Amino acid sequence: IQEITGERGIFSIQEAEPIGPKGLLDILVIAPCTGNTMAKLAAGITDTPVLMAAKAHMRNDKPVVLSPATNDALGASLKNIGFLMNTKNFYFVPFGQDDCEKKPKSMIAHTELIPDTIEAALCGRQLQPVIRSPF
């Protein structure tokens, strides 16, 4: 990504913190967004650069797009997904079960829908339907 953009990445919590005060982003995409990351977002924990970037960005009342990839979306992570879906400025890339036979609680985002999700989120809309057919 650094080669494509010509910009240095953000690799520390301290480097992520100015995202908010400086208004550096229009939108933030977290892809993939694991169950652990969603749990920490829901709990307000900022112990990684990604989580600090999200917290700092949300100070500006701007959208955060989550692209879920978790083996327990229909288990322990479900409460966090529900909480985040009901929280202002969080938008989800539509997702579905990736292997309902071997991993019945697992769901992953339809990543090909990230661009459409970004467009919708920038207009304050959640791309629908959020839960889609299995892969």
Protein language model features and the residues they cover:
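A cross-family phosphate/adenosyl-ligand binding-site feature
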Residues: I1-V64, N71-F135
